[in-house]
Amino acid sequence: MPGPADEHLQRMRVEYGSVEKDGSPDLDVDWLDDGWVALLRKWIDDAERAGVAEPNAMVLATVTPDGRPASRTVLCKSLDETGITFFTNYDSAKADDLAATPYAAVTFPWYQLGRQVHLRGPVSKVTAQVTEDYWSKRPRGSQLGAWASQQSRPIASRAALLEQLAQVTARFADHERVPVPPGWGGYLIAADVVEFWQGRENRLHNRIRVTGDRVERLQP
């Protein structure tokens, strides 16, 4: 039951409506004339220009093997009409979830801009070539970190983690190129449904949903 300590939380409120004050247009179905990919790319670019930290960050929701929801933040690294791609350790908890239930949802939350995008659909692993192409663009430190971490597995201390990093750093010291770890790669989320959300006054937000070729406005 909510108590006195929750009153501060209950008073927390953001009044949306900056789109009215600065003269920007309302989100509407015609914003999707060029497709959902074009608008999502634009909103990511808008977030970057606005100084949003990690504008391509998205909250990934999965279902655990025992049927419980789980979420975490990952980064969108590719985007086209087939869907969106992120990369991770194939032995991680999220990978276990996706092996059991190959379906996921993501949310791009740009709170500073009063915008969100929700996307959901079936998930599949990308090809080894797609993984290789992205891996080659990662900083060497990130590559070594992927080798050092047995993602989602317990470890005694941070010192132990840094020792694992030191070991792989020494292992690949004479290698010009760090190879892709055998248990690392990408996932593609095919977009069954995409929803664009824009905050508005009095909680009468703009919601536009794309399902296949159908684009429609939803009540908030």
UniProtKB/Swiss-Prot annotation:
Catalytic activity: pyridoxamine 5'-phosphate + O2 + H2O = pyridoxal 5'-phosphate + H2O2 + NH4(+); pyridoxine 5'-phosphate + O2 = pyridoxal 5'-phosphate + H2O2
Entry EC no(s): 1.4.3.5
Co-factor remark: Binds 1 FMN per subunit.
Pfam family for this entry, one: PNP_phzG_C
Pathway it works in: Cofactor metabolism; pyridoxal 5'-phosphate salvage; pyridoxal 5'-phosphate from pyridoxamine 5'-phosphate: step 1/1; Cofactor metabolism; pyridoxal 5'-phosphate salvage; pyridoxal 5'-phosphate from pyridoxine 5'-phosphate: step 1/1
PROSITE patterns recorded: PYRIDOX_OXIDASE (PS01064)
GO molecular function, one term: FMN binding
Cofactors demanded by this protein: FMN
Binding site for FMN: 72-77, 87-88, 94, 116, 151-152, 197, 207
Residues that hold substrate according to the record: 13-16, 77, 134, 138, 142, 203-205
Family annotation (InterPro entries): Pyridox_Oxase (IPR000659), Pyridox_Oxase_CS (IPR019740), Pyridox_Oxase_N (IPR011576), Pyridoxamine_oxidase_dimer_C (IPR019576), Split_barrel_FMN-bd (IPR012349)
One GO biological process term: pyridoxine biosynthetic process
Subunit description: Homodimer.
Family, per entry: Belongs to the pyridoxamine 5'-phosphate oxidase family.
HAMAP family referenced in this protein's UniProt entry, alphabetically: PdxH
Cited function: Catalyzes the oxidation of either pyridoxine 5'-phosphate (PNP) or pyridoxamine 5'-phosphate (PMP) into pyridoxal 5'-phosphate (PLP).
Name assigned to this protein: Pyridoxine/pyridoxamine 5'-phosphate oxidase
